[in-house]
A protein has these predicted regions:
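NAD(P)H-binding glycine-rich loop region in Rossmannoid oxidoreductase-like domains
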Residues: 36-91
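A conserved pocket-lining segment of Rossmann-fold NAD(P)-dependent short-chain dehydrogenase/reductase
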Residues: 163-180
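Conserved Rossmann-fold NAD(P)-dependent oxidoreductase catalytic core, especially the SDR/UDP-sugar
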Residues: 29, 83-125
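Short, polar loop motifs at secondary-structure junctions
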Residues: 30-37, 151
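N-terminal Rossmann NAD(P)H-binding glycine-rich loop of SDR-like oxidoreductase domains
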Residues: 2-24
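Glycine/proline-rich active-site loop of Rossmann-fold NAD(P)-dependent oxidoreductases
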Residues: 140, 154-162, 192-201
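Conserved beta-loop-beta element that borders a ligand/cofactor-binding pocket
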Residues: 135-155
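Substrate-positioning beta->alpha
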Residues: 129, 176-190, 201
Length: 207
């Protein structure tokens, strides 16, 4: 059975992922900077950038739920991935909680959601930083999977118990809506983490 580490687990997505892992009876440890807010009892209290190879050596799957929003911290969306890739055990998987802004608008892969007219200006710096992190991740020597949520990512939305996995292009349901709850996103993350699918690949998740 795989042993899981959720990094930056105190955030909303991180907590949902931990809850889903534990509901399945899986072996879960969390890495958090401050007091643990998750259901997990196995805890490493350390900043992501202070984690060492020894800290993560026993984990088969590391789920990175790190996020940074302050302008001065946005480059950490790249440096955090570089750090984790450098310290993970040779055969470990790295699953990254990603963003929707870098999803492409069509199969040409020339323009992303963040470049579209309706994308909120306030979120463009974050979306760009996360896109740069993904671009760097593609070059790193690590077994990664990057999971982009739907354009409308609903923190407190209901758990419907279903989702659709798509590729690098933003897709919608039959009503033209790209939406997903954090709860169903967490289910998708854990399903992928336990399935061994989508190696060195970015996928998108929506209802």
């Amino acid at each position: 059975m795989n042993i899981f580490l959720v990094v930056a687990a105190n955030g909303k997505a991180g907590q949902k992922i931990v809850t889903e892992l534990m509901a399945r009876g899986l072996d879960v440890t969390v890495a958090v900077r401050q007091a643990n807010k998750t259901q997990a009892s196995q805890v490493i209290i350390k900043d992501l950038f202070d984690l060492t190879a020894a800290d993560v050596s026993n984990f088969d799957v590391v789920i990175d739920a790190f996020g940074a929003w302050a302008p001065e911290a946005l480059p950490q969306h790249t440096s955090s991935l570089e750090h984790l890739a450098a310290i993970l055990a040779p055969n470990a998987r790295l699953l990254v909680v990603g963003g929707a802004g870098s999803l492409y608008l069509d199969a040409s892969h020339t323009a992303a959601l963040k470049d579209s007219d309706g994308f909120p200006e306030a979120f463009k710096p974050l979306a760009s930083a996360m896109g740069e992190g993904l671009a760097r991740l593609r070059t790193l020597d690590v077994d990664w999977t990057y999971l982009s949520p739907a354009a409308d990512f609903v923190a407190d939305g209901e758990k419907k118990g279903h989702y659709v996995i798509e590729g690098e292009v933003l897709t919608t349901d039959d009503k033209g809506v790209s939406q997903l709850s954090y709860a169903d996103y967490a289910t998708a993350v854990v399903d992928i983490a336990t399935s061994g699918r989508y190696h060195r690949e970015r996928v998108s998740v929506r209802w």
